[in-house]
């Protein structure tokens, strides 16, 4: 049973117990949802208490990850961690598995997911009279030796048609609906292409638990009409005994919904401390404002924070995951060393491109480059104001921040979604950000909040720019782009691979006109 970390004594006890467990095994497998697993030495598993909270950090293929631990459990075979980050907007269940027992754990997980897959197959078959299960298996895992997270089922109905059924059979996080839908759409479209003989595969059923049904229904509204009409969304009850159809709204119905409370960005004010720090390296350092202060970033990597309390400014410094120190006379040497390290290693000209500071937060680095001169991407965009990591709802709502929200000179809003590595969810994330932005635009929140000052906004939906290095678009990008409704005007921007040295657009493709 998960033990909640609710006070300092419980946190200290948990830290001591976790430290004992980690020290007892030389190597661990770190797993987070569908992102695969990473092998860690015990010295690479960093648990520490900071600001009366327990934090865990380690290096993965995506760079340094830091989580706040809200609860933990040792099952006897693995360490379960309930974690969150980004002010609680992203939540996950992490697993640390001793390397020696990883193979046995993988086999047990595989058996459990297969059993769930067969249960889903029987439920789906029972929901349609005359149907038979033709095939039931798991999707491919993140790696060859890992079990898949989704059920892949084919039903044959009275020899007239075949129905593809996809379902979640593994624990999901708050943002996993895009991953599930992307995977299901790719599988379904490939099945249809290969279905050369009758009975043909014409329908797709999506089976999810209650917590994900509403979010998935909203996303389905963003698909092109002919695809939506062959998709049925089914909700599982808590006991996995019954399937209930869930209606997906039409695209126009989304605009009638009352949006969540709009969160205005903080005022455009810079403290003297922030100004002084930026002056140390104005070509590399920028500031991101929050309600309770400012975050200073070196090419997108947060390294200092300014807080104002009782009319006094305080500066705390340190890379995320490391212990933060108050900047004063006693820490000047550490502060200077941090700045020297950033200058040496977080640079396009860095000699060691495997250094932790070079590899950390690559998407934030790209975002920082574009914030400095957004016209590198599109000369028609207003250089300022430009809203980075724009989150229109409260941080605890579970909504992800939009990478960049800009304004074209003709008054059209532009949602910019950045990736620096292959990401299957790129297209659906861009479409979802379009939906959220359009709801707030139609209700007048963006105009009333004066996000772009006195600049007039045109009465048109936003554009979506999907940006990634030339060779870093997912191989299924084109398939998923074809699935999006034509009302969502999307563009693909291929930028140079060496974007750290300066962003250049290598190719721009109008997706909407190409696919529809």
Spans of model-derived segments:
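Charged, terminal alpha-helix-loop-beta segments
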Residues: 1-516
């Amino acid at each position: 049973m998960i033990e909640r970390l609710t006070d300092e004594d419980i946190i200290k006890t948990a830290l001591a117990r976790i430290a004992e467990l980690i020290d007892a095994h030389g190597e661990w497998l770190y797993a987070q949802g569908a992102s695969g697993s990473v092998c860690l030495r015990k010295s690479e598993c960093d648990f520490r208490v900071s600001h009366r909270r327990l934090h865990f950090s380690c290096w993965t293929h995506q760079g340094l990850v830091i989580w706040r631990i809200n609860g933990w459990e040792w099952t006897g075979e693995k360490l379960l961690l309930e974690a969150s980050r980004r002010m609680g907007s992203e939540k996950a269940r992490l697993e640390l598995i001793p390397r020696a027992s990883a193979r046995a754990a993988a086999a047990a997980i595989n058996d459990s997911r297969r059993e769930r897959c067969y249960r889903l197959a029987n439920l789906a078959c029972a929901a349609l009279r005359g149907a038979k299960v033709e095939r039931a298996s798991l999707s491919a895992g993140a790696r060859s030796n890992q079990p898949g997270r989704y059920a892949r089922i084919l039903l044959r109905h009275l020899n007239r048609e075949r129905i593809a059924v996809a379902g979640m059979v593994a624990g999901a996080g708050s943002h996993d609906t895009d991953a599930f839908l992307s995977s299901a759409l790719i599988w379904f479209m490939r099945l249809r292409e290969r279905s050369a003989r009758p009975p043909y595969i014409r329908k797709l059923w999506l089976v999810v638990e209650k917590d994900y049904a509403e979010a998935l229904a909203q996303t389905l509204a963003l698909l092109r009409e002919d695809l939506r009409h062959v998709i049925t969304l089914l909700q599982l009850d808590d006991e996995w005994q019954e399937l209930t159809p869930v209606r997906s709204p039409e695209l126009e119905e989304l605009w009638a919904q009352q949006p969540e409370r709009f969160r205005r960005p903080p005022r455009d004010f810079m403290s003297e401390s922030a100004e002084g720090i930026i002056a140390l390296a104005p070509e590399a350092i920028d500031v991101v404002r929050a309600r309770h202060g400012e975050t200073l970033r070196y090419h997108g990597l947060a390294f200092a924070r300014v807080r104002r309390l009782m009319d006094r400014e305080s500066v705390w410094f340190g890379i995320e995951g490391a212990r933060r120190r108050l900047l004063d006379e006693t820490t000047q040497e550490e502060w200077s060393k941090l700045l020297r390290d950033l200058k040496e290693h977080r640079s396009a000209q860095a000699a060691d491109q495997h250094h932790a500071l070079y590899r950390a937060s690559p998407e934030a680095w790209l975002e920082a480059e574009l914030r400095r001169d957004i016209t590198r991407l599109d000369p028609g965009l207003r250089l300022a104001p430009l809203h980075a990591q724009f989150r229109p709802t409260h941080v605890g709502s579970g909504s992800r921040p939009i990478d960049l929200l800009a304004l074209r000179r003709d008054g059209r809003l532009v949602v910019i979604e950045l990736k620096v590595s292959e990401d299957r969810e790129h297209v659906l994330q861009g479409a979802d950000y379009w939906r959220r932005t359009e709801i707030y635009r139609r209700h007048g929140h963006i105009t009333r909040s004066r996000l772009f000052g006195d600049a007039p906004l045109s009465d048109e939906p936003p554009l979506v720019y999907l940006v990634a290095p030339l060779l870093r678009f997912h191989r299924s990008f084109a398939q998923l782009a074809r699935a999006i409704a034509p009302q969502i005007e999307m563009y693909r921007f291929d930028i140079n691979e060496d974007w750290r040295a300066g962003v250049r657009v290598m190719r721009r493709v109008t997706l909407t006109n190409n696919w529809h």
